[in-house]
Amino acid sequence: MNIWQKKSIISWLLFPFSCLFWLISQIRWYLFRKNWLKSYRSPVPVLIIGNISVGGNGKTPLVVWLVEQLQARQINVGVISRGYGGKTTQFPQLVDAQSQAEMVGDEPVLIVQRTGVPLAISPNRKQSIELLLSRFPLDLIISDDGLQHYALQRNIEWVVIDGERRFGNGFLLPAGSLRELPSRLTSVQAVICNGGTANIGEHFMKLDATFAQNLLTGEQRPLSHFTQACVAMAGIGYPPRFFNMLRRLGLQLTQTYSFADHQAFNAVQLATLASHETPLLMTEKDAVKCRHFAQANWWYVPVNATFSAESTTYLMTEILKYLGKSNE
């Protein structure tokens, strides 16, 4: 939301509610810390990838990157997710590559299709962990989101921030976009800066894209081949990031369409966005919800998180050290 980027009359009017939000959050955190509210400790280490603000900071590409890094090092890893946007009421539930995004959520399906990682969804993180451990011998569990879910004890915390938007106007919800104050970053094990400019102590993450894949045929085509005018759509937390990336890569976008994060789509809704001669580009997260009614001119653009060699070594060494393994 644009009103969260700068201080305005509206944000100042909402500021008292932000103070109330902060007070309730602090009381809740204190109750968990004193064990007056019960929390669950997993038998295996838990690494949480979360954020202190709302709205599309890039957690999913980071989860995919981390899973692939751990799998390459022979670490048995599982992922738990809330399953936002899914309609299912059956919890906990394992997600596989054939799961319907409309039922279990778009992000879990994307993560499983990219990595094949064991993944369970439930609003109750304990249920998800117990289901995974009953089926798979795991060394580590990654929680996709859940930084503020203090009912789950954690061993490692990573926070992703948007390097361009940073902390917006600096206010907590609802006057701003923050769930917690920036001072929270001093207590986490790693701060990941997605795009923009990383501050000292932050690990810069870049999202790279090189090709588009046709939803209907599976054909892969380098983005440099899209020399004609294109239309782009995105139903993610911050759609401008996707559109700006395509423009930086040299694509000519005649029209862009922004949808709500986790929004469900149908054929009628999307059929009129682009003519049959014009490519319609979308995110991979949107594609998992559109494949069963895709048209011939629909393409999705996978993105991959990349880090410097130094950041990769540091991040992986810290995890492997915790697991009692070497980073070779």
UniProtKB/Swiss-Prot annotation:
EC number annotated for this UniProt entry: 2.7.1.130
Biological-process GO terms, alphabetical = lipid A biosynthetic process; lipopolysaccharide core region biosynthetic process
Q: Where are the transmembrane segments?
A: none
Top EC category: transferase
Q: Which SUPFAM superfamilies match?
A: P-loop containing nucleoside triphosphate hydrolases (SSF52540)
* Pathway(s) it belongs to: Glycolipid biosynthesis; lipid IV(A) biosynthesis; lipid IV(A) from (3R)-3-hydroxytetradecanoyl-[acyl-carrier-protein] and UDP-N-acetyl-alpha-D-glucosamine: step 6/6
| Entries under InterPro entries matching the protein | LpxK, P-loop_NTPase
Q: What is the catalytic activity of this protein?
A: a lipid A disaccharide + ATP = a lipid IVA + ADP + H(+)
Q: Binding residues for ATP, per the UniProt record?
A: S53, V54, G55, G56, N57, G58, K59, T60
Quote the Pfam families the UniProt record gives. LpxK (PF02606)
What are the alphabetically sorted keywords of the record? ATP-binding, Kinase, Lipid A biosynthesis, Lipid biosynthesis, Lipid metabolism, Nucleotide-binding, Transferase
Disulfide-linked positions: none
An example Gene Ontology CC term for this record: plasma membrane
Q: Which GO terms describe its molecular function?
A: ATP binding; tetraacyldisaccharide 4'-kinase activity
The record's NCBIfam families line, in alphabetical order, gives:
lpxK
Q: What does this protein do?
A: Transfers the gamma-phosphate of ATP to the 4'-position of a tetraacyldisaccharide 1-phosphate intermediate (termed DS-1-P) to form tetraacyldisaccharide 1,4'-bis-phosphate (lipid IVA).
Query: Can you tell me which family this protein belongs to?
Result: Belongs to the LpxK family.
Q: This chain belongs to which protein, by name? A: Tetraacyldisaccharide 4'-kinase
Origin species, per record, is Haemophilus ducreyi (strain 35000HP / ATCC 700724)
Gene that specifies this protein: lpxK
